[in-house]
């Protein structure tokens, strides 16, 4: 799949923008704070309805305006899709596919699959379990609408159960209603655990060869899914935890507490890995993500690289860019020196200055 073009109106620092991309390597360069990442953010929004930064809709609307518009033309398996997205200050987002409004984000997922790689992706490895759950969920939700539905229902049930736990502290007679939410939590949670385990196992099979190649065969990276509780024992553990849950007024077992372990040669690299090992593992993860998506949907996702090359040494840069021959890639950076020096193939170049984009090389 490819992004053919993006049109922006009152999005971030862009009053108007109409940009068309090459099918392979696109470079967007310019000084910091000129608007390079905003173009990638618009592309990511078009595939997921959310900002990769976690920004609210109103924060992405140009200062002084009431709404922003993004139009993205996508080509996938010889079929063209037009994705229109309206962001409004009141939070009422509107999305249409080929001029037909959609009611749920799930209707959009799968049309434009995005793999986004930025220096912040080191947080997947370095930070707490929430970052790794977020990574798993974002990818699975793009690939599997049933998973998206079960995850959404699980999260809603979790909120309701936690609210009830707080209410029981003041109204003990409500405790009999806890069983209703427990049954729903178990139903949706088991599906979430099962799919996450399958996803991590599949990703682990792919990532080992990629990481071995990047590290020159010196390291073996293993991913392991670490659920807070196995789906088989979920019901028993939820019952055992009930008194603790009532005391803390929150649900203490379930997939909302899962984690994923990154280990190199048996060592947990979140705790004990060098920054070089963590960067190599993050790169391996993103390249594995591309392969996994391609395997599952029979189409290559679009890769967005946000100022990530400056974080990689020459060997990692070479491996990354030489691995992308069949992948549309949009790269932001502050200059072109690395591309010229290493003679990387570049198909289209854009220069950004204060929200104005100029095509440098057709």
Curated annotation (Swiss-Prot):
A GO CC annotation given for this chain: cytoplasm
Keywords recorded for this protein, A-Z: ATP-binding, Cytoplasm, DNA damage, DNA repair, DNA replication, DNA-binding, Nucleotide-binding, SOS response
Subcellular location: Cytoplasm
One GO term (biological process): SOS response
Binding residues annotated for ATP, in chain numbering: 30-37
The keyword DNA-binding is assigned to this record: yes
GO MF: ATP binding; single-stranded DNA binding
Origin: domain of life: Bacteria
Classification via CDD domains: ABC_RecF
Functional note: The RecF protein is involved in DNA metabolism; it is required for DNA replication and normal SOS inducibility. RecF binds preferentially to single-stranded, linear DNA. It also seems to bind ATP.
Similarity section: Belongs to the RecF family.
NCBIfam families: recf
Descriptive protein name: DNA replication and repair protein RecF
Organism: Agathobacter rectalis (strain ATCC 33656 / DSM 3377 / JCM 17463 / KCTC 5835 / VPI 0990) (Eubacterium rectale)
């Amino acid at each position: 799949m490819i992004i053919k073009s993006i049109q922006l109106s009152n999005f971030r620092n862009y009053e108007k923008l109409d940009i068309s991309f090459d099918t392979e390597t696109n470079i967007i360069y310019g000084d910091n704070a000129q608007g390079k990442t905003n173009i990638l953010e618009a592309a990511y929004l078009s595939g997921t309805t959310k900002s990769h930064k976690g920004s609210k809709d109103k924060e992405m609307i140009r200062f002084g305006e009431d709404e922003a518009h993004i139009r993205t033309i996508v080509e996938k398996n010889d079929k063209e899709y037009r994705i229109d997205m309206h962001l409004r200050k009141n939070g009422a987002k509107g999305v249409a596919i080929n001029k037909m409004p959609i009611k749920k984000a799930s209707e959009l997922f799968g049309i434009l699959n995005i793999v986004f790689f930025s220096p912040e992706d080191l947080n997947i490895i370095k930070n707490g379990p929430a970052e790794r759950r977020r990574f798993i969920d974002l990818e699975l939700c793009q690939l599997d609408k049933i998973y998206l539905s079960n995850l959404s229902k699980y999260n809603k049930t979790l909120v309701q159960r936690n609210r009830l736990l707080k209410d029981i502290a003041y109204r003990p007679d409500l405790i009999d209603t806890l069983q209703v939410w427990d049954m729903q939590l178990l139903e949706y949670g088991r599906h979430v655990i099962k799919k996450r385990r399958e996803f991590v196992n599949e990703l682990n099979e792919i990532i080992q060869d990629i990481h071995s190649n990047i590290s020159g065969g010196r390291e073996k990276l293993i991913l392991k899914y670490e659920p807070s509780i196995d789906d088989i024992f979920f019901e028993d553990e939820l019952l055992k935890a009930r008194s603790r849950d009532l005391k803390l007024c929150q649900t203490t077992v379930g997939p909302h507490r899962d984690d994923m372990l990154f280990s190199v040669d048996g060592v947990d690299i979140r705790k004990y890995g060098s920054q070089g090992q963590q960067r190599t593992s993050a790169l391996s993860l993103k390249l594995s993500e591309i392969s996994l998506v391609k395997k599952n949907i029979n189409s290559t996702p679009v890769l967005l690289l946000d100022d990530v090359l400056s974080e990689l040494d020459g060997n990692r840069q070479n491996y990354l860019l030489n691995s992308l021959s069949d992948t549309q890639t949009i790269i932001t950076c502050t200059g072109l020196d690395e591309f010229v020096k290493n003679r990387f193939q570049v198909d289209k170049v854009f220069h950004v200055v204060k929200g104005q984009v100029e095509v440098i090389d057709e």
